[in-house]
Amino acid sequence: MKQFLRQTVAALAILSLVACGGGGGGSGSGGGGGTPTPSPTPTPTPTPLDDYSAPAQIALTGDQVGKIVAQAAAQARQSGHPAVIAVVDRVGNVLAVFRMTGAPAGAKIPDAPDGNNIDIQGLTVPAEAAAIAKAVTGAYLSSGGNAFSSRTASMIVQQHFPPAPSTAGLESGPLFGVQFSQLPCSDFSQRFQAGGAGALIGPKRSPLGLAADPGGFPLYIGGVLVGGIGVLSDGDYGFDPNVLDTDTDHDERIALAGTVGFEAPAAIRADRIYVDGTQLRYTDSLYSSLFDVTGATWAQTAPALGALVAVRGYFETAALRAGTAYGAEASGVRAAKASEFADRDAFVFTDGSGANRYPLRAGTDAADVAQPLTQAEATALLEEAFAVMTRARAQIRQPLDSRAQVTISLVDTRGAVLGMVRSPDAPVFGADVSLQKARTAAFFSGSHAAADLTADPSADVQGFVAKVRAFLGDPTALTGTFAFADRSGGNLSRPYFPDGQVGNPPGPLSRPIAQWNPFTTGLQSALVLTNLGQHLQYVTGASATDTPQRCTLLPDAAPSQNRLQNGTQIFPGSVPVYRGNVLVGGIGVSGDGIDQDDMISFLGTNNAGVRVGSIGNAPAAIRADRIVVTVGGASVRLRYVGCPFAPFLDSSQQNVCQGL
């Protein structure tokens, strides 16, 4: 498959998608663009919130989308770097893909450091796919309390944090592995529909997951997040390995020009946010370095500088589209009804017709578990985790001492969703990621992990079982003898073990450092390689069939359901759920700092156990932090969870997870 993928996609992905598109369209009038917005079920009147404020329901109009594209194109024209420009709304609907005359057809993914490419390293992918992924990244990583760019993403996914030649020895980025989320195969992420009530339902998938290549920014109107812009002009789709220098990146400058008038508030940009004492990076470009693009108009831009183009599976219109307002029924994310979740601050994911996509329910795994989770237990787990979140001090939000905002997902041992809930303004990326985390904790804690991996048709995937067993010195590893939180599995998924310690071998679920970059992480990337290949062939027109809406080729645990249907995740924020010493599920959290995510999942599970008396965290004796690995003569213990200092806004408590 790898050789076929490399030969087919590398040849076909460089093809221009202009032929698929047609000419440029007008922006229309009344803010609607050329494509009318469907009429979904009206959003219920929200109940007043207790702890949070819901974002105003504001959406980009077609005229505004045209203005954003025109400004970016004006910067590209004056700098002599024709570009592909994509705009999305907050839930990932693609509102425009504009190809300037002379823009590159493809974008090259970096080779492996040692030249031995694996997974998607070295491929050339469609420039349109890269631009969309950058736009999605800018929108999905941001919120009303934080504005992150694809340059920010680059900083937090590499083998050292911050990434720089002088930081060897430091641990990996806090969101190491998040680039393999929002995947085109995800069973959670929605897919483009040409019309009907579900046309704008999100969150939508990304063709390449999240991007680490600079040139993607969020878009705001009056401080309200409304979408993202992504640009590809240089023919490369990579990452920035050194934050100590200042790049002249034309993708980034062109995208930044598109945000003029739609800028992120300065107070919430990434460079106002610190993680472990390190200031995050938002952009290497300044607004003062841009050409004056304020007079650019859509009428001057199309067809003079290029045309809108169709992108199969994402954008199939010859006209600009208006976005949908996040929080409205049409967006797929809205305030929960009282009948759906007890806390008045809760938001849920909907189908556009009023129904909650993931209502609270009991476990589906009665054939595998003597006593599956009951609906009452599932309710307790999500309610208690939500309650911890409302008290938690955020790490990545401004102003300081804001409340954490996350998405929380609960699954059974088969990976079936038993409920999902989120705060009103949690970053969108955390939805798919929280589900990945929940499934990952349940998967690696289960008795079936080794058998499932061995049943995958890829010899590469199969080989990770033997690597784990040899590394841990345990021939029974991955058969349910230990409980793995995502932090534990993440320890084994870094190119150095222990994390960041140069000169040490890789964890058994990682690629060696000589081969590693953000485009091949190890088991995580190997599991979805076939899906990515299928999808890129579909996007380029090489195949009439898209990848199924289920990631990985693992065997089914239930009809049409494998245990990792949206992939796996390798940074902290989940724990398995037990009834005594029997695994019954997993809970995942994502959207704030990794210690906050860990605390919400761990304390939420503990508190649910106190409340219902029948479930809880894994017994201490079987947690992965009882596993000790000998490396270079030293004994290294895996980690289970890590909870933050001064975690709560309403209490001076410390060490809140200790002893539980």
Predicted feature descriptions by range:
Residues G21-G26:
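Bacterial signal peptide processing site
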Residues M1-V9:
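Bacterial N-terminal signal peptides that target proteins for export
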Residues P36, P42-L660:
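Flexible, solvent-exposed loop/hinge segments and secondary-structure transition points
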Residues S16-A19:
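C-terminal motif of bacterial Sec signal peptides marking the signal peptidase cleavage site
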Residues G30-G31:
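Non-catalytic, C-terminal membrane-associated alpha-helical segments of glycosyltransferases
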